[in-house]
Regions:
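N-terminal positively charged helical leader segments and presequences
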Residues: 1-49
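RNA substrate-binding interface of SAM-dependent RNA methyltransferases
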Residues: 3-9, 13-17, 28, 70-158
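Short, hinge-like loop/turn segments at secondary-structure boundaries
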Residues: 27-30, 54-56, 122-126, 168-172
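Hydrophobic alpha-helical segments and helix pairs
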Residues: 43-85
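Active-site/ligand-binding-proximal alpha/beta "capping" segment
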Residues: 153-193
């Protein structure tokens, strides 16, 4: 699998190092010249924010992405997230988008930080594989419309349901805030509701 992030180094605790089935992973990391820092269980527990850890912590370099360089002519399905605030919801959306074959996720202002530990955990690794772009609403809408995407907003008050709509061509599906839905300006710029 090609990850969009570069693994810089890992920390492991004493318990992780002792387990025989972890030796293969540690050898692979060493073969790839990834630095491994060994810590006591006590120090490791102070580095993480969960009580029951697996004993390994990775540090990755994540490259910021822009629309122009990360959405291309081959992309057909993009997800736009408008002010998603719950970390668990964000992680689940990213994980689901990855498994559904979404080409990119666009995060608009007001979304929870995707580097929040709860977001990262709930993605179950998908965050490192997905093309995630943070940008403004105006920039996203202008770029997508210029590149022939239909902006389709999930909207409570509509005359057609998702299974009654055709999804030909390039689609940018908008999912709104848990409490307030999609903002009115984005609704007005949508091609379909």
């Amino acid at each position: 699998m090609l990850f969009r992030s570069k693994l810089e180094y890992v920390f492991i605790n004493e318990d992780f190092e002792k387990k025989q089935d972890h030796k293969v992973l540690l050898e692979e990391l060493e073969n790839k010249n990834i630095k491994i820092y060994k810590t006591s269980n006590k120090i490791f527990s102070e580095m993480v924010d969960t009580e029951n850890t697996q004993g390994i912590l990775s540090v990755l370099r994540y490259k910021e992405r822009d629309l122009v360089n990360n959405i291309n002519q081959d992309n057909k399905f993009v997800l736009i997230l408008d002010r998603i605030q719950d970390p668990g919801n964000m992680g689940t959306i990213i994980r689901t988008a990855d498994s559904a074959g979404v080409d990119a996720i666009i995060l608009l202002k007001g979304c929870v930080d995707i580097y929040n530990p709860k977001v990262i955990r709930s993605t179950m690794g998908s965050i490192f594989d997905m093309n995630i772009i943070q940008t403004t609403q105006d920039e996203a809408v202008d770029f997508l419309k210029a590149n022939n995407f239909d902006i389709v907003s999930s909207y409570l008050h509509t005359e057609s349901y998702y299974n009654e709509t055709t999804y030909d061509g390039k689609i940018a599906l908008v999912i709104g805030n848990e409490a307030n839905g999609i903002n009115d300006e984005l609704i007005s710029k949508s091609d379909k509701l």
